[in-house]
From Swiss-Prot:
It catalyses: L-glutamyl-tRNA(Gln) + L-glutamine + ATP + H2O = L-glutaminyl-tRNA(Gln) + L-glutamate + ADP + phosphate + H(+); L-aspartyl-tRNA(Asn) + L-glutamine + ATP + H2O = L-asparaginyl-tRNA(Asn) + L-glutamate + ADP + phosphate + 2 H(+). The keyword Protein biosynthesis applies. This is Aspartyl/glutamyl-tRNA(Asn/Gln) amidotransferase subunit B. Its EC number is 6.3.5.-. InterPro entries: Asn/Gln-tRNA_amidoTrfase_suB/E, Asn/Gln-tRNA_Trfase_suB/E_cat, Asn/Gln_amidotransferase, Asn/Gln_tRNA_amidoTrase-B-like, GatB, GatB_Yqey_C_2, Gln-tRNA_amidoTrfase_suB_CS, Gln_synth/guanido_kin_cat_dom. GO terms for biological process: glutaminyl-tRNAGln biosynthesis via transamidation; translation. The gene is gatB. Keywords: ATP-binding, Ligase, Nucleotide-binding, Protein biosynthesis. Allows the formation of correctly charged Asn-tRNA(Asn) or Gln-tRNA(Gln) through the transamidation of misacylated Asp-tRNA(Asn) or Glu-tRNA(Gln) in organisms which lack either or both of asparaginyl-tRNA or glutaminyl-tRNA synthetases. The reaction takes place in the presence of glutamine and ATP through an activated phospho-Asp-tRNA(Asn) or phospho-Glu-tRNA(Gln). Heterotrimer of A, B and C subunits.
Length: 493
């Protein structure tokens, strides 16, 4: 039986660590990398007689997220105790939200795939609620024992729960990437997956197309997009194989082993009633006035979806280019800063050329140098000056790469005219004068009679060889379009 006989159903629960300086219910620091247990307050380690105090910054970030996804921000929500035993949970319960979460509903539009096969899909969200993180168990440095680090206990989390709207690992990864970009865009989470600031749990089940939902298994704590895709793909094949072999899927929590590429059983999956949720008597209901929500809404930056639409409408970019430029806040900021110092009048080639250079040459060079775009040696103004000279025909794309390399190496000085200084200093201005090009073309035709004869015999590749010879003779300065036109005219004569 083929994979097409089954429908995959995926929902994600994402834990985004909120970037507050202190914890959600105590004044202890949330800084990463401290020595074990030096950032655990009396509240975090559950000493008798201490009470939690809610961090308003965590609430503000939850509101910001709710506004960004078009959700309902609850005017009143309640904190609840989620009761379970684990060594790194000193209270014996986790403070979370259950029946009345702070964010309800909302949606995120994702783009899946590339090129002609790419499509957009809207994933509905169920809720997002505030909760505290647990501590961390340490096993590597102990023999026959485990250590407990409570530095992370009490760190503020926003748990973001999607509807089971995704039908493939590709859709799940696209959703996770879009969510990751959004929480960084609105500055509520640093998104550092290596440090555990953005962790995914995937609920996966399979069913016959149109049939009832199957039994789900939850894959816990996936901290990379690659592992998310691999884990879901393995789990889907495992579930299909189990059912087709006559077995039954049992509700369970599983872990993904990156070394084997397989999921393995962690424990049977609990339901909500197993946690005996009840309102936390130490915390009043969270009341959010409408004025607070209105203020947060007024302070929101332009969101990726709106910016993408603006890039398409105002600059004529393709949906792919606009999506790529708005995939991260830093990339979008660089591109907009570049346009701010360039000619963007209607009909200008600069926006499209600039997009190509930001996503092409600049991105490739940054990747090779292992640098972020915010640390680029080529400033937005310098790139704007370079792109402007390509657009007005001063230099060709090939020459532009030489100018870009010089800019990268710190030549030309600062500002939008840095490219101009390099062009003049190195004599790189493109030759557009037909009277200057004609002798070069005549020399190439005279010296390459074989290629001329081959072209006239119908071999198109011979024409490209002749163009290459002219460009070589001009040391790359000839206008390629003009060379093409003049060569064709002479060869057709």
């Amino acid at each position: 039986m083929s994979r097409n006989d089954w429908e995959v159903v995926i929902g994600l629960e994402v834990h985004a660590q909120l970037n507050t300086a202190s914890k959600i219910f105590s004044a202890a620091s949330t800084a990463f990398g401290a020595e074990p247990n030096v950032q655990a307050s009396a509240v975090d380690i559950a000493l008798p007689g201490v009470l939690p105090v809610l961090n308003g910054g965590a609430v503000e970030r939850a509101i910001r997220f709710g506004v960004a996804i078009g959700a309902t921000v609850a005017p009143k929500s309640v904190f609840a105790r989620k009761n379970y035993f684990y060594p790194d949970l000193p209270k014996g319960y986790q403070i979370s939200q259950f029946e009345l979460p702070v964010v309800q509903g909302g949606a995120i539009t994702i783009r899946v795939g590339d090129g002609d096969k790419a499509y957009e899909k809207t994933v509905q969200l169920t809720r997002a609620h505030l909760e505290e993180d647990a501590g961390k168990s340490l096993h590597e440095d102990f023999h026959g024992m485990s250590g407990i680090d409570l530095n992370r206990a009490g760190t503020p989390l926003l748990e973001i729960v999607s509807e089971p709207d995704m039908r493939s690992s590709a859709e799940a990864v696209a959703y996770a990437r879009a969510l990751h970009a959004l929480v960084r865009w609105i500055d509520i989470c640093d998104g550092n997956m290596q440090e555990g600031s953005f962790r995914c749990d995937a609920n996966v089940s399979v069913r016959r197309p149109g049939g009832p939902l199957g039994t789900r298994r939850e894959i816990k704590n996936l901290n990379s997009f690659r592992f998310l895709q691999q884990a879901i793909d393995f789990e889907v094949q495992w579930q299909i194989g189990t059912i087709e072999d006559g077995g039954r899927i049992q509700q369970a929590t599983v872990l993904f082993d990156p070394d084997t590429g397989e999921t393995r059983m962690m424990r049977s999956k609990e339901d909500a009633h197993d946690y005996r949720y009840f309102p936390d008597p130490d915390l009043l209901p969270l009341v959010i006035p409408s004025e607070w929500i209105a203020r947060v809404r007024s302070e929101m930056p332009e969101l990726p979806g709106a910016m993408k639409a603006r890039f398409i409408n105002d600059y004529g970019l393709s949906a792919y280019d606009a999506a790529s430029l708005t995939a991260a806040k830093e990339i979008a900021a660089y591109y907009q800063a570049m346009l701010a110092t360039a000619d963007t009048k209607p009909g200008s080639q600069v926006p499209k050329l600039g997009a190509n250079w930001v996503m092409g040459e600049l991105a490739a060079q940054l990747n090779r140098a292992e640098r972020d775009i915010g640390d680029s040696p080529v400033t937005p103004a310098q790139l704007a000056g370079l792109v402007q000279r390509i657009a007005d025909g001063t230099i060709s794309n090939n020459i532009a790469r030489k100018v870009f390399a010089a800019l990268w190496n710190g030549e030309g000085g600062s500002g939008a005219d840095a490219a101009d200084r390099i062009i003049e200093a190195q004599g790189l201005r493109q030759v557009n004068d037909s009277s200057a090009l004609e002798p070069l073309i005549d020399e190439v035709l005279a010296a390459n009679r074989k290629s001329v004869d081959e072209f006239r015999a119908g071999k198109e590749k011979a024409f490209n060889a002749l163009v290459g010879q002219v460009m070589k003779a001009s040391r790359g300065k000839a206008n390629p379009a003009q060379v093409n036109e003049m060569l064709k005219r002479k060869l057709d004569a």
